[in-house]
Amino acid sequence: MNIFKALFGSKSKPAEEVKKDVTRDFNVLKYDGVRALRERQFDYAIQCLLRAIDMNGADLECRDYLSQAYIATDNLSQAYEQLQKMAEECPDNIAVLLRMADVAYMMEDYTAMADVCEKAMMLDGDNVQV
């Protein structure tokens, strides 16, 4: 029976297998990007992480790594953009807000830095990093 399936069956993969392949490809791209980031191959890390985000834009961990790669390559506006998207998804994350403030400071955008610091202080005024 398998012979007839192989000869006359359709060549398309089942939806479950396609989804499995997409998930595997996403994970490969994500972790290749993380590895490249740790090895200080920032351009390759950016390429991998951008493709991973194209596959799954809801993954905030990829955006975090991408922002780190952008900061390392001095693409501060793009790093700030990724951090803004992360802050929209989880507005109560102090670490994201602090990194946004750092990037705004590096861009010499002091009004944006002050706004982000105010948000962070509203969330946790006792935090010494804020």
Where do the language-model regions lie?
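Polybasic, Ser/Thr-rich amphipathic helices
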Residues: M1-S12
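Helix-start (N-cap) detector for alpha-helical repeat units in TPR-like alpha-solenoids
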Residues: D25-N27, L60-E61, I94-A95, N127-Q129
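Alpha-helical segment of the N-proximal tetratricopeptide repeat
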Residues: K19-M55, E61, Y65, I71-A72, ...
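Conserved structural position within tetratricopeptide repeats
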Residues: R51-D54, Q84-E88, E118-M122
